[in-house]
Amino acid sequence: MKDVSITKKQLKIKNISYGTAVLGNYYEVLSNEEASKVINKAFDLGINYFDTAPLYGFGLSEHRVGMNLQLKDRDSYILSTKVGRLLSPADPKEIDRGAWKGGLNFNPYYDYSYDGTMRCIEESMHRLGISKIDILHIHDVDYFTHKEKHLVEKYFSEAIKGAYKALEELRRNDNISAISVGINEFEMAERFLKEVDVDCVMLAGRYTLLEQNSLKTFLPLCEKNKVDILLAAPFNSGILAGNENNLNWNYAKASKELIDKVHSLKKIFRI
């Protein structure tokens, strides 16, 4: 692994990091013991940047990340989580867990307001048991998540006027180190970059061996604005990971066309 930095803030991280959605029992159940082994093995291998979110297992991932990182020197790792969803206690029978195979008994709901963002951060700190978060991502303001244009526009406006305002205040007062956007579409990330001053963007699945459309306008804009890119879901949620039993793309079953394309890539790269 190589040392890299988030340019504007000089946060030193490795070029490989650990996204902890799986610790929220994403697609399969993981025990607390297994989760601890994974986190500590990643740390022992030199990974020093860990990302989580309230959504992941409806708080479970944050609990597990915090439970293990609490025991380590706080200066030895960089930690990020996300804002935009709050968690409300719920009857387990009434929770739509989707792809989460278990998790905590809370229902997530969207809130990109100033007050909602401040509350979200405080609740994340309590779940983590860690009072310092380095990077905060404004999470999922995109069509993939919200589907309808009026909802995307509503939450984008709310995030600019509310969530970003809260994060900028925290950054200005050195309570956090960096502001980011965690998003599934580079087009929406571009809109944020044109409106507000972010330090980095966590882009999920849009710059991989299968997709490079973000090269045309998004990457040049990041370079111009000195915004670093954190590439999430580099295996496009499974199809590029080499496991023939997990041919998912964009969190759903891949089409035959995409599967054929991946098989062609394997021949090119001899894997």
Residue ranges and their predicted role:
Residues 21-23, 53-55, 82-86, 138-141, ...:
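Active-site beta-loop-alpha junctions enriched in small/polar residues
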Residues 1-92:
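N-terminal binding-site loop/beta-alpha segment at the start of enzyme catalytic domains
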Residues 29-42, 113-127, 184-191:
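Short, acidic/polar
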Residues 21-33, 102-118, 152:
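Active-site mouth loops of central-metabolism enzymes
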Residues 3, 34, 141-271:
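Beta/alpha (TIM)-barrel catalytic core signal, keyed to glycine-rich beta->alpha loops juxtaposed to Asp/Glu
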Residues 13-17, 48-49, 76-82, 132-137, ...:
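Structural preference for beta-strand elements that scaffold enzyme active sites
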Residues 89-100, 244-246:
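Short, flexible, mixed-charge acidic loops at enzyme active sites
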Residues 125-149:
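Active-site groove signature of glycoside hydrolases
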